Amino acid sequence: MDLPIVLSHKTAWLYHNVARPSEPLSRASSLYDEDSLANEAEPTASLPKLGLDAKGLRASTAVEIVADYLVSLGVPREELDHIDTLVNFDFERSTPAGFRCHVFGAPVPPGHLIEVAEGLLVVDEAMCFVQAGSWMSESEQLEYGYEICARYHLNHLSTGDYIEMGQRYTVADLIAYCNENRSRQGAVRAAAVLKRVHDGARSPMETATAIMVVAKRSQGGLGYAKIELNHRVDVPNEFKYLAKAGYFEIDVYAPASGTGIEYNGSDHLDKQRSASDAERMTVLSALGFRMIVLTGTQFAHQLQLHRAMNAIALAMGLKCDRSEAFQKRQNDLREFVIRHWDGGL
């Protein structure tokens, strides 16, 4: 069995769902440079030893080893009917049962490979994002772009809550990868999706709010991509008597119209939090921002969210599409963005 094995495509996405860490992982120097891998002494010493380097290892056994490792991390076994792998060139492709081998068509960029166990690598999320177009819908890939560039992590394979974490990639990082690999499959579509992705979402519902605005009209969104997330507004000295905070951040902000959209989840029901929210809205309105609040209840009901999105469109100077066909698409998008919502977001 040729080593290392490189997990890619949907298998890589499954891995990143369950194992996305808060700190950078060990980057491989090259795909098949054994010396460079051996030189990574310190990180390699802590890598799991799976037995992939055993002499005479059968491909079927390697499949079992990799599948068992992924299951141990939390990937459901039913998601592993095959394991996606990546090689540099077509002549390196093999088709043992259980593996689905993909060809990059050039030396795989070493900076986008991560060592996860001895003899096992995984493509990073920049590369995985481009590959995602081969199995994700455009809405799913749009959401994935926000998640990669977010300040939280949500495991789509678990019913657990999201966790806050540092931002691992920027939209600029993903665009740079697409530009460097434009001839690779999926890069053109990924670059188009990234025109609607923005950095720094702090929660899944903040991502959901942004997607309802930026997604194409054909997907049920408002089709308005020129927004910012968590736009900082410093309180001027002459308004500081109105607020305790020295600055505020607007969840979703459209600079051209001065429209701000806030998502208030269940945590905003706390009395002290409600008072702070009221103070914040007062100051932002006094500063000339057009502020609109979305709630979990509105996201949970089609007509309530439709009316709220009409208000947002009106504030932004956009056409309000009230046709039955658009409302159907908008509701499909609403159901998509809240599909992991447990009522507490």
Where are these regions (language model features)?
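Surface segments flanking catalytic/ligand-binding clefts of nucleic-acid enzymes
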Residues: 164-345
